[in-house]
């Protein structure tokens, strides 16, 4: 039998913080464990799995993990790691212990996600049109106009249904019972959804008996929902939209996902060289002549989309694409300029957006955030670097950040120099006690910190599959779940009532 009996909560140092002006007070607690309560007993919705897991041997679980890795590698479910001396292609480590939500928990999350994404789309429309939120003094104009993701080329450009972020990946963490926080909004080219679907397929292949014990909400219909969403935001004059997936190419870290989604939706996977613009319309080169393209699910960043409008050295985009987009002849999902809403410098204002545009209180809370561009916040951050997580406002993938409690004095002092040189580029947040989930590691089953990325589709209506991609920090004590930093993934179960 495996060393499941050793599974227990990891201790965490209790700390508190009280900044000036905002008077936030966040107390570090023992991490909330998804499976076990404070007494060490399995939570009701985990009891069946808990009993099943105790009966599995280390040998069997190790063999199952090796089988999953072999299948993922054969199928090509890998991602690229740039600058990695060990090789450019890796499988994302898959953990066989699922993360389980009750139907009630998911109901709360789904309501909060719908609310948040709706407000974010309203915000993007507003900043490129009437600027009411700036006029109301809720967000300073310079926070938007000086944002590297703000695209003045999109001023007064209308998009179908006024939806700019058709696909959103919202990163959520849990700090306690029913205590969910949004850690980050991903509105440009959110990735990871293919791993959500493939993780479910793998769990059903490895442990089919578990799905006889639980009624788990399905996720495999995500590509169908995505295609339905993309077709619903077609240009107004189009009857039967032609949808394509635009990829930077096979060397992109998420190329598997691009090809997977195109194949599952039954649409063409194209690169920039496969498309051209004529008379402000986009066409695809085919063996039977040019074919008009109406909706592009683009997995290429703004800067590389159009060499005539953005980076002139880009070979990944399509010359003239911006003009076709502005003319309303092609829909880009997501629209150019959506990044203005997911930049970390804008993140602190999302609760205000929800109240301003929807007249509602946020269902999902933000993590308290200090904006280092503000003198008081900077002073507090500098005095508490050993307790905080400090991030670049334009950063991604777990790079360019400091996790104070996990850093050495030398690392903290080195980071202090960067922060003082460019305080406007940083935000800081308390080090939350992210929830843990049992994870199969070399020593047996042990708690590891996790987050959740649900995928929200906004078209004619807002839809999502139950759950999302659970990411896990495989290193003991680590809070960094990104695959580029050694993180893995888990299947996410939402139980049906």
Where do the PLM segments sit?
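Preference for protein termini
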Residues: 2-497
């Amino acid at each position: 039998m495996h060393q499941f009996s050793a599974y227990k909560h990891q201790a965490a140092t209790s700390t508190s913080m009280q900044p000036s002006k905002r008077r936030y007070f966040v107390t570090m607690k023992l991490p909330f464990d998804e499976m076990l309560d404070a007494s060490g007993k399995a939570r009701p919705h985990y009891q069946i799995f808990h009993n099943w897991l105790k009966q599995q041997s280390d040998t069997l679980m190790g063999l199952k993990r090796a089988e999953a890795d072999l299948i993922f590698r054969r199928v090509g479910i890998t991602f690229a790691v740039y600058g990695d001396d060990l090789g450019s292609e890796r499988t994302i480590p898959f953990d066989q212990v699922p993360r389980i939500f009750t139907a009630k928990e998911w109901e709360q999350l789904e309501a909060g996600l719908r609310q948040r994404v709706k407000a974010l789309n309203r915000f993007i429309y507003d900043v490129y049109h009437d600027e009411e939120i700036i006029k109301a003094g809720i967000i300073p104009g310079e926070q938007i106009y000086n944002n590297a993701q703000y695209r003045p080329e999109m001023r007064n450009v209308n998009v179908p249904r006024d939806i700019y972020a058709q696909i959103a990946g919202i990163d959520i963490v849990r700090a306690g019972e029913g205590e969910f926080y949004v850690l980050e909004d991903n509105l440009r080219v959110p990735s990871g959804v293919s791993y959500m679907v493939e993780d479910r397929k793998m769990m059903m292949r490895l442990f089919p008996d578990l799905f006889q014990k639980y009624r788990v909400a399905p996720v495999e219909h995500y590509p169908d929902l995505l295609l339905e969403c993309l077709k619903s935001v077609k240009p107004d004059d189009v009857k039967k939209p032609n949808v394509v997936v635009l990829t930077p190419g096979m060397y992109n870290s998420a190329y598997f996902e691009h090809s997977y989604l195109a194949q599952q939706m039954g649409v063409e996977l194209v690169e920039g060289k496969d498309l051209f613009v004529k008379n402000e319309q986009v066409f695809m080169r085919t063996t039977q002549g040019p074919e008009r393209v109406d909706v592009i699910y683009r997995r290429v960043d703004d800067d590389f989309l159009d060499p005539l409008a953005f980076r002139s050295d880009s070979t990944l985009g399509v010359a003239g694409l911006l003009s076709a987009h502005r003319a309303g002849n092609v829909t880009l999902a997501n629209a150019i300029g959506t990044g203005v809403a997911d930049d970390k410098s804008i993140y602190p204002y999302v609760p205000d957006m929800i109240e301003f545009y929807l007249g509602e209180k946020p269902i999902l809370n933000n993590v308290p955030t200090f904006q280092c561009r503000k003198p008081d916040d900077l002073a507090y951050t500098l005095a508490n670097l050993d307790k905080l997580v400090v991030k670049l406002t334009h950063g991604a993938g777990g790079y360019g950040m400091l996790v104070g409690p996990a850093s050495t004095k030398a690392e903290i002092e080195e980071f202090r120099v960067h922060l003082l040189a460019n305080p406007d580029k940083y935000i800081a947040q308390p080090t939350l006690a992210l929830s843990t989930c049992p994870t199969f590691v070399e020593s047996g089953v042990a708690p590891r910190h996790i987050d959740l990325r649900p995928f929200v589709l906004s078209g004619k209506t807002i839809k999502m599959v139950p759950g999302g991609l659970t990411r896990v920090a495989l290193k003991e004590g680590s809070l960094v779940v990104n695959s580029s930093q050694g993180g893995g993934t888990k299947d996410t179960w939402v139980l049906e009532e």
